[in-house]
């Protein structure tokens, strides 16, 4: 059987569209060419006639060839295919998956899964959330939500960290361990409780508070109650987190820079004056050293140190923890000037003899 080119199968029907396979006989064991192969090396129809194939002697799948018949044999790409499949059946690779469009397969069973076979009888027919064959598809990579199926929406709980939304599944909220349903465009009126919205109710909408572990925000005008706005960063921030004068209606508290609430529902216990000069009438309360600051004791914000603690002038009264007397028994001369104050903003006395005033003794500071 001689051939002038590297044809795959002879177009002569007397050879039965046979192809020479490597290793089928000794004379052509290392070549795909059919020039030197005897007729006994050609084996029956592993490929279609030569015009349908390439010039290299390679068996071609029936499904991927335009010459292949209407039958579709199972393959790794189509493990669920039946004999009624046509070349229009879905084909897949390890990177991209496609679905059966115009084929005996129903579109309901065509749900792509990460790096898994999806065809006429896909793995979506057996799901972990419910037993019905039209149940939603779920995998460890990407999950989809069931909208028009016997499965309840409760079975749609994706385990991946990326929202998966389609145009027809807008009524089903996407939730994952990374992105909450609030930030998902497919979430409308339904809001499932999540670690991001521990206090949210079923009436929450996407306008509900959203948070992160770095910069929390609060809900201002939304159906969510203020109780659901509990950030995990620093210390909970209420209402509008800012230090400006026009937002004094609610205290901002954090471990970084707290603000003082003057006329607000917050009590003065949350007032730590660090922001503006208008907050000098609010006593500084800290776990390190409380001060009995009056209006003349605290400097303006421009004189406050880097740690945002008000320092006392030389006329400030500093209570000594070991003294039982009131703060007024301390003389102003006990406090050093601003240049002598430490970086922690603690007023310090110039001489230990000043402390004797707390016990009623006389001393010159």
Swiss-Prot record:
Tissue specificity statement from the Swiss-Prot or TrEMBL entry: Restricted to a narrow region of the hair fiber cuticle, lying approximately 20 cell layers above the apex of the dermal papilla of the hair root; not detected in any other tissues.
Entry annotated with the keyword Repeat: yes
Its job: In the hair cortex, hair keratin intermediate filaments are embedded in an interfilamentous matrix, consisting of hair keratin-associated proteins (KRTAP), which are essential for the formation of a rigid and resistant hair shaft through their extensive disulfide bond cross-linking with abundant cysteine residues of hair keratins. The matrix proteins include the high-sulfur and high-glycine-tyrosine keratins.
Native organism: Homo sapiens
GO cellular component: cytosol; keratin filament
Keyword Repeat: yes
Region annotated 29 X 5 AA repeats of C-C-X(3), chain positions: 41-338
Name of the encoding gene: KRTAP10-6
Keyword set, alphabetical order: Keratin, Repeat
Assembly, per entry: Interacts with hair keratins.
Sequence repeat intervals: 41-45, 46-50, 67-71, 89-93, 99-103, 109-113, 114-118, 119-123, 124-128, 129-133, 135-139, 145-149, 155-159, 160-164, 172-176, 186-190, 208-212, 218-222, 228-232, 233-237, 238-242, 250-254, 260-264, 270-274, 282-286, 292-296, 297-301, 316-320, 334-338
Cross-referenced InterPro entries: KAP (IPR002494)
Pfam family, one: Keratin_B2_2
Stated family: Belongs to the KRTAP type 10 family.
Protein name, entry field: Keratin-associated protein 10-6
